Swiss-Prot record:
Record-level Gene Ontology MF annotations: RNA binding; structural constituent of ribosome
UniProt keyword list: Ribonucleoprotein, Ribosomal protein
Transmembrane segments: none
Gene Ontology biological process terms in this record: translation
GO cellular component, one term: cytoplasm
Lineage, uppermost ranks: Bacteria, Bacillati, Actinomycetota, Actinomycetes, Mycobacteriales
Protein name, UniProt field: Small ribosomal subunit protein uS9
Organism: Rhodococcus erythropolis (strain PR4 / NBRC 100887)
PROSITE patterns referenced in this protein's UniProt entry, alphabetically: RIBOSOMAL_S9 (PS00360)
Length: 170
């Protein structure tokens, strides 16, 4: 092992390095402060609609603290499944504003999965109205695409939409 004297390290060099590190740290802090998102100010609540399968969701979004009111209930009460909760919060997390808005939603029709998908679409559409700059990121993530898949109708003469009774040649 070599001693600091042998490495030709003086206190002046150490102080110079410390000053450079401190200056870099100040620059990083300033960049982070500039990068933090400005608070949202809206003159009126944003209202949007989302649809998926048979579900229709109307969303009213206002600046707030991240509260969800779904048919008068909290997000955890209405959607006990964590997968649905993550699906719904995904657009807010993507634009880094998970606790910037209060969301009041009226959901009807369909089941939990369809309602969760419809709510995600409605929230993504509302975010675009608030900050149009987020559109490319939301589009790339696929949050603005209406999922057109729905149950195919049953046809007469068949048991289900496409299932037929077994064919007998003779």
């Amino acid at each position: 092992m070599t001693s600091p004297e042998e490495q030709n390290v003086s206190e002046e060099n150490i102080e110079a390095v410390e000053e450079l590190v401190a200056a870099d740290a100040v620059e990083v802090v300033e960049e982070v402060a500039a990068a933090t998102l400005a608070p949202i100010v809206l003159d009126r609540p944003v209202q949007t609609v989302g649809r998926r399968k048979e579900a229709v969701v109307r969303v009213r979004m206002t600046p707030g603290t991240g509260q969800f009111k779904l048919n008068g209930r909290t997000l955890e009460d209405y959607f006990p499944n964590k997968v649905h909760q993550q699906l719904i919060k995904a657009p807010l997390v993507l634009v880094e504003r998970p606790e910037s808005f209060d969301i009041i939603a009226l959901l009807h029709g369909g089941g939990p999965s369809g309602q969760a998908g419809a709510l995600r679409l409605a929230i993504a559409r509302a975010l675009i109205e608030v900050t149009p700059d987020d559109r490319p990121a939301l589009k790339r993530a696929g949050f603005l695409t209406r999922d057109a898949r729905a149950v195919e109708r049953k046809k007469y003469g068949l048991k289900k939409a496409r299932k037929a009774s077994q064919y007998s040649k003779r």
